[in-house]
A protein has these predicted regions:
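Extreme N-terminal starter segment of soluble prokaryotic enzymes
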Residues: 4-12
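Conserved N-proximal alpha/beta basic substrate-recognition cap immediately N-terminal to
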Residues: 15-113, 122
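Short glycine-rich anion-binding loops that position phosphate/pyrophosphate groups of nucleotides
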Residues: 66-68, 138-139, 246
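Rossmann-like NAD(P)H-binding beta-loop-alpha module
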Residues: 112-132
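Protein kinase-like catalytic core scaffold
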Residues: 132, 165, 187-188, 227, ...
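Phosphate-binding site of ATP-dependent enzymes
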Residues: 143-222
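A long amphipathic alpha-helix within ATP-dependent nucleotide-binding catalytic cores
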Residues: 195-240, 244, 252-284, 288-301, ...
Length: 311
């Protein structure tokens, strides 16, 4: 068990929109400072780092940022044994929407049907049957999301620079149910859905037993302790459309002391977090798909002769 006196915590932050400090995070850090923790923070994009010289210098890193640079630096620290909240492996799995969607399905979390591709023209036949939401596979803050209802709207979407996750559009009430979790405590706020809704606080909402169960199941599967979910309340029940580690907790009353308590407990080693190992328990779906099963033709003609010559 660690002693809090003099423990060094480092918050790996992201540039905020608007560019003002998070009141929740400021209050939580003030509480931790009064309890004897030393707090540092920084934004990866605002400094320069020589990767081969980077070494863990804090007792705990709190990964708040979702940017590629922050995740890369976190991976270097993780490889050298740095403790992180949330754990690095949990964050990297959560950030990858393709991996996350498969895990949701594997453990029975209700989530939309989805497809992945790097070529949106391949989704023509799918969008003819249903509206779709197109997301960068490692996006955050709603950046790069498009909603398309027909092939013409699909054709108007710029070609993606990275792979995309294409989700079946789920009709809801027009509001997001934002669910926030700290350990075993679950909170929720409602806000109108929009591309900039992540900047709005929303209004507090009751958490149903079903939503609470879904939220805690996600934390157990991904190994998360501080996280949030976007839920659509469909006619058939709640559906998870996104999962994020260390969200802003906007609109949750008196949340900063609860976050500070959780960070303190983790820093002092009172508990750990670990993603579930599903390799032994996962069962194949009833309708299985093999990767490239139908691709018997070499797709790059100029390589055909070279491959035959190498045999």
């Amino acid at each position: 068990m660690h002693s809090r006196r003099g423990m060094k915590l480092c918050f790996m932050l992201v540039r905020r929109i608007p560019p003002v400090p998070s009141p929740v995070l400021v209050e939580a850090c003030e509480i931790l400072t009064r309890r004897g923790f030393h707090i540092d923070s920084g934004i990866a994009e605002d400094v320069y780092v020589q990767p081969d010289l980077l070494r863990p210098a804090h007792d705990l890193y709190l990964l708040k940022s979702h940017t590629e640079l922050s995740l890369s630096l976190a991976s270097i620290l993780h490889a050298q044994g740095a403790r992180m909240l949330n754990p690095y492996r949990s964050c990297i799995t959560t950030q990858d929407k393709i991996m996350a969607s498969q895990l949701f399905r594997a453990v029975g979390v209700p989530t939309p049907r989805c497809w992945v591709t790097g070529d949106l023209t391949l989704m023509h036949s799918v969008v003819e049957e249903r509206p779709l939401i197109i997301k960068p596979y490692r996006g955050h803050r709603g950046a790069g999301i498009s909603v398309v209802h027909n092939p013409d709207e699909l054709a108007a979407v710029p070609p993606p620079e990275t792979p995309v996750l294409t989700q079946e559009f789920i009709q809801g009430s027009g509001e997001d149910l934002k669910v926030y979790v700290v350990g075993e405590e679950v909170f929720a706020v409602r806000k109108e859905f929009s591309a900039m809704s992540f900047t709005q606080a929303g209004r507090p909402s009751q958490v149903s037993p079903e939503v609470r169960d879904i939220a805690l199941r996600c934390g157990q599967v991904f190994g998360l302790g501080l996280y949030g979910l976007d839920i659509i309340e469909s006619p058939t029940g709640p559906v998870v459309v996104d999962l994020n580690y260390f969200p802003g907790y906007k609109g949750v009353p008196r949340i900063a002391p609860i976050i500070a308590d959780y960070i303190e407990g983790f820093a002092l080693g009172r508990f750990e977090l670990e993603p579930l190992d599903l390799t032994q328990s996962a069962e194949p779906p009833s309708e299985a798909m093999s990767l490239f099963a139908e691709q018997s033709v070499i797709l790059v003609p100029e390589l055909a002769g070279q491959e035959r010559g190498d045999q």
